[in-house]
Amino acid sequence: MSNNDYETVVGLEVHAELSTKTKIFCNCSTEFGSAPNTQVCPICMGLPGTLPVLNEKVVEYAVKAGLALNCSISMDSKNDRKNYFYPDLPKSYQISQFDKPLCNNGYIEIEDDNGNPKKVRILRIHIEEDSGKLNHNEFAGGALVDLNRAGVPLIEIVSEPDIRSSGEADRYLKKLKSILQYIEVSDCKMEEGSYRADVNVSVHKPNEPFGKRHEMKNMNSFKSIQRAIDFEIKDQIRANESGETIYRETMRWDDVSGRTFSMRDKEDAEDYRYFPEPDLAAIKLSKEYIDSIKNNLPEMPESRKERYMQELGLSEKDAKALVSEKAISDLFEKAGKICGNYKSVCNWLTSDIARIQNERELPSEKIPFSAENLAELVEIIDNGTISTKIGKDVLEIMFDESKTPKEIIKEHGWIQISDESEIKNVVLEVLANNPQSIEDYKAGKDRALGFLVGQAMKQTK
């Protein structure tokens, strides 16, 4: 039986670390990459007698995200304790939100697999603290706990079960990431774990109830998420067709083998024994506070796309590609403003730069050259200093070396001769040095002309 005989249901719970300078309940730094256990205090270590103080910036960023994602903002919410034991959770509970989250009932607009507009509903957005991190160490004979991440503020964005394929999941996650970056509440660096997703997948036959779902936790690669969803769809259909019982389980995705493995039964809300956090007051928001955040939201991707099409004359395809990532859109705007040739900057970003990024699996935030250098590359091609072909070689070097385009072409002797009199002198010299080739060409040997052209190119290189 094929996939077409079943319907797929995907739900996503996205955890995005907020870009605050300090943690959610204490003044410890949230900077990534510090030595283990150097950004901790009695509060985030969960020591007895300590009391949390809510970081006001966390609430502001969560409300900002909710507004950007078309949510209703709750004027009366609270924190709750989510109780479970794990070595990287020092208090043995996580301060989160249960029945009264900050944001409810939002949506994101994406395209379905046929290119048609589709709304994916967002059930809720709530704030919570991140856990610590286990570093497995063979020399220690186990795992070492690093609590630098404990207490880093998160928003959890929970979708309704509206997604029907791995492709839709991919587009949803990328659109969500883009929006969070545009409003600057999270850097969404997947390689650092600041944007990760719990992925729930189930299958069922049309007009039948949803099937039991498998959950894969803390996934931080778009490619892996798509592969994991596709595997689960096929494996659950196989299990259904062979009469196996599918249980609600938490699964582990293995990138090497390309399959999932069962870890444990899936927990229910009652397993966490939620109860109100007694050490924190309720979160009361005024309409004026919410409106002030709403009125200061930055330009969103859709608005930028329309502006690029109307003011700069870009095609919808190019405008859509540029605004899909804030880093690319910002690079485009800055470089275009410097050199004045927005269309040429667009062509480089959507073709050769995108190709090199894809080949090197390089996030847009890590493009190693500045807008000034990209603008300089466009300018020296526009004024005839180098050809577009040489420009592609210069671009490759710009990804590897911290040099300006002018420094690169000078170093490699790639400056193109554009003076007609100088070119004429070169041609006359080549003709004078190769009389036999001239005679061969006159005799109908076309290859002789290619030889002469090659000699001229060699001298002008």
Which residues does each PLM region occupy?
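Structural motif
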Residues: 313, 336-345, 385-386, 443-447
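Strongly charged, low-complexity linkers/loops
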Residues: 365-375, 379, 385-458
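Core structural elements
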Residues: 192-205, 309-333, 342-360, 372-374, ...
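Extended, structured, electrostatic nucleic-acid-contact surfaces
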Residues: 302-309
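Generic, well-ordered alpha-helical scaffold segments in large soluble proteins
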Residues: 61, 65, 172-175, 179-182, ...
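Extended, non-catalytic structural segments that build the interaction scaffolds
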Residues: 289-296, 303, 333-338, 374-386
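Basic, nucleic-acid-interacting segments
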Residues: 1-299, 316, 337-341
